[in-house]
Amino acid sequence: MREKKPYQVLTFHTTDAAMEMESFCKQNGIAGQLVPVPRRLSAGCGIAWRMEAEVYAQYQTVIADCGIEVEQSEALVF
């Protein structure tokens, strides 16, 4: 069985915003990936950006200042 890890999950109102976050993070070397929104959360578009909690802690300010509207930001364990 794989060990569970803490992740930060960002949800968005639109698919465009989710895709913008993916592009922004890749351009800035921020590790993460697009995933379906976990059942515990709800989001307008159904797509979320997931990154390890440590990565989010390191880049939280950069992400907040990037200009992409985030609907929710939740810490979850997968």
Predicted regions located by residue number:
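Short, flexible, solvent-exposed loop/turn segments with mixed acidic/basic and small polar residues
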Residues: 1-2, 34-40
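Short glycine-/aliphatic-rich beta-strand segments at the starts of folded cytosolic domains
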Residues: 2-11
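Small/polar loops that bind or transfer phosphate-bearing groups
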Residues: 10-13, 51
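Short amphipathic alpha-helix segments
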Residues: 14-31
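A short linear hydrophobic-aromatic micro-motif
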Residues: 31-37, 71-72
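Short, charge-patterned binding micro-sites
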Residues: 39-47
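C-terminal structural segments of small proteins and small subunits
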Residues: 50-78
